[in-house]
Amino acid sequence: LTPRPIALMFPGQGSQHVRMGAGLYGADAAFTATMDEVFSLLGGEGARVRDDWLGRTDLPRESFDDVARAQPLLYAVGCALGRAVLDLGLEPAALIGHSVGEMVAATLAGVLDLSDGVALMRDRVEALRDSPPGAMLAVAASAEELAPRLRGDVVVGAVNAPRQTLLAGPAEEVERVREELRADGITCRPARSQQAFHSPVLEPFVRGSAAAWGRVGLRAPRLPVYSARLGAPLTADHARDPRFWAGQPCEPVLFWPALDRLLADRDVVLLEAGPGQGLSTIARRHPAVAGGRSAVVPLLPARPRHTSEDLDAFTAAVLRLRAEGHAPRARGVVPAAAVHLPAHSD
């Protein structure tokens, strides 16, 4: 039997945590090399970002949720996990990303190089440094149900599932909407973000980034990318358009429509290449997965207490792919020496 092809899913803002994926650092060669490449590309800031990621500093948890740390590290970890999969000799049939995860998908599909991605991440961090305090709110309701309840600059920031919507906007306005929703018995919880991602609030702050994207040699994807910006496959024209990427932080994430299209086009094994297993939880609700035509395999644990769980989860995922009929190569091992990691996660 021909095995179901794999598709890689990359999570975005809200999934981050200190030491995400760190159990593969110093253990998997491709993952380690990619993370080190990112830290090198970050220049003088790289060592500090690395230490914050590994929990070697006294960085408060809430500061890790800020764009300055969360976005570059989510991008780095996603690219590192994707390259670790490619290093096993496994070619994905499709890529899909949520928020910053779409930049990861574009990088692995060859739309842009890792070095350009890191530079653009630095540009995004700088552009959003002076943005007003923002918030995001996960709500157990459809976007249509929520539309009449939105106030001021609060908008739908993401459609994650038919009844799983993310709202975004200025922090005080989001809080008022949260109080109204809770008073009406609608389940909601704050997402881990200090910026109003995927709302027009950020438009003035990212307006100038089209110039930075324009300096990058953007290319058509060499692998199929299902764009959560479009809710559809990424076209060559969109991939090469600097304005498409510059505007991404201000536009809603249509993750469920994009996932729905992917799973309508083909039956796959969805590998979540990032922390938290949030996209895995969403994807398991899709009829194609619930009915067994497609499957979901996370590469990292949901809430690790020890860094060794990262390697255990990655190894279990590889074994699952073998059971599916794939023939992954032996994982590249880092020569003994290098990295001393703290044992426990927060």
Where are these regions (language model features)?
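A generic structural motif
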Residues: R163-G169
